[in-house]
Amino acid sequence: MDSVAFKDVSVSFSQEEWALLAPSQKKLYRDVMQETFKNLASIGEKWEDPNVEDQHRNQGRNLRSHMGERLCEGKEGSQCAETFSPNLSVTKKTAGVKPYECTICGKVFMRLSSLTRHMRSHTGYELFEKPYKCKECGKAFSYLKSFQRHERSHTGEKPYKCKQCGKTFIYHQPFQRHEQTHIGEKPYECKQCGKALSCSSSLRVHERIHTGEKPYECKQCGKAFSCSSSIRVHERTHTGEKPYACKECGKAFISHTSVLTHMITHNGDRPYKCKECGKAFIFPSFLRVHERIHTGEKPYTCKQCGKAFRCSTSIQIHERIHTGEKPYKCKECGKSFSARPAFRVHVRVHTGEKPYKCKECGKAFSRISYFRIHERTHTGEKPYECKKCGKTFNYPLDLQIHKRNHTGEKPYECKECAKTFISLENFRRHMITHTGEGPYKCRDCGKVFIFPSALRTHERTHTGEKPYECKQCGKAFSCSSYIRIHKRTHTGEKPYECKECGKAFIYPTSFQGHMRMHTGEKPYKCKECGKAFSLHSSFQRHTRIHNYEKPLECKQCGKAFSLSTSLKKHMRMHNR
């Protein structure tokens, strides 16, 4: 017996014929065709002819249009987007109608492709087999077109080229979305926040930010997502699949976005530039989020506490503060994190990976933020300026601390002696005077430090390493701050000026010591005799009297002294 073809069970009407049908006849037609589609879907029909497959899809789409009574009667055919049969035009899809029903669980779908995907969720049941398998990564596909599209992710082929800017794309849909960025057309507007989007699918995904809907759930860990692409990427964290490889170094990634971000380390390409400050980005979405820094726009508000955010990922991470969720767990030490970037940086503590390398001096960093900050030591860039005095800084935190000099704010108070400090670093350094303890200890001499960076700088006093060299005179230094201060001896810059007498200083320590001459403050007190000093160096010299330390030796006769003034006085005896 011959197999039944699609054309044997389908029925078509011309536009004129359809107009002559009574409402009851139209309803009967719709019921029959719906039943036909259900039957074809349930037997798992495989389409040998791609034209028939396309016809099946078009018929399915247009059947949904006929499920309502709104037909294109009395309208020009050119106004209609889809054709049900060669001569019959119809209106848009009727909302809420889902003619494709799963025979296993009864769930219904708008599209046959959606039903196909769903059927695979039932173990051991496939609506269509997947005859097209990728040789690169092993992924299989039901349709040849889908397989051919996937292959481009490996070959790098981008057949869709924008005539406006020359940008190329692997897939047609992102290409269409990109074209709309040139014409500025964004016909789909969110009723909640007014945001306009270029396509209806983007609007549907965006609306889930407001509703909180996350229809895509991971079967492995139960985590839910608002869009299908996110769950596909997430599932790779369980399977270990990394289909996107860097052509430069071979490193593999779970998402296309990740490999593009990584490629910056090789080529530095950032095509999207901010008109306000000139900062460049890899993706237009990153630029849009950045632009909100200038506009002050924060469209995402937390329903729990009312805090607003510039981007959707920030609010998602913030909400975990309320829920306590920490989905990223380190396999090495068990520590959990609420945000993926923090988790990735933490993992590098175990692996020792430092992917961001400075081209100037070769120093490597585990975080891109540390790398960018370090680059400023070479360029001399100081983008953060104090509006009060005009002083500029490399880092935003330094500016924040500096501002306290103007406001007088000292938020860090010592519980031992009630002394207050403008910065956490100064406070921690002070606490050592009480406890004598620090978390980072030098293996050579036992000296303790609050910060690992301070320990590294100190260790150079033992190794003799001086990686920072002055280009003017060739003098080398163990610490980046030392070379910055040293450069002022060449430029003549004296940024620390006394408001009392106008005297200016190169070094902040000299300036602070000078200011105590005006205030009378003497913070360094000798425990032996109670004598107080305004300068730490003076205090150190004084303590040598009590412990009989005499580190300064005369090269002529070998006599030792505790003070440099005493040594100088002694030297005059030899010079007579």
UniProtKB/Swiss-Prot annotation:
It comes from the Eukaryota. InterPro entries: Ikaros_C2H2-ZF (IPR050589), KRAB (IPR001909), KRAB_dom_sf (IPR036051), Znf_C2H2_sf (IPR036236), Znf_C2H2_type (IPR013087). Keywords: DNA-binding, Metal-binding, Nucleus, Repeat, Transcription, Transcription regulation, Zinc, Zinc-finger. It is found in: Nucleus. One of its GO terms (biological process) is regulation of transcription by RNA polymerase II. SUPFAM superfamilies: beta-beta-alpha zinc fingers, KRAB domain (Kruppel-associated box). A zinc finger (C2H2-type) spans 100-122, 132-154, 160-182, 188-210, 216-238, 244-266, 272-294, 300-322, 328-350, 356-378, 384-406, 412-434, 440-462, 468-490, 496-518, 524-546, 552-574. Residues 4-90 form the KRAB domain. GO terms for molecular function: DNA-binding transcription factor activity; RNA polymerase II cis-regulatory region sequence-specific DNA binding; zinc ion binding. It holds the Pfam family KRAB. GO terms for cellular component: nucleus. Belongs to the krueppel C2H2-type zinc-finger protein family. May be involved in transcriptional regulation. This is Zinc finger protein 791. It comes from Pongo abelii. The gene is ZNF791.
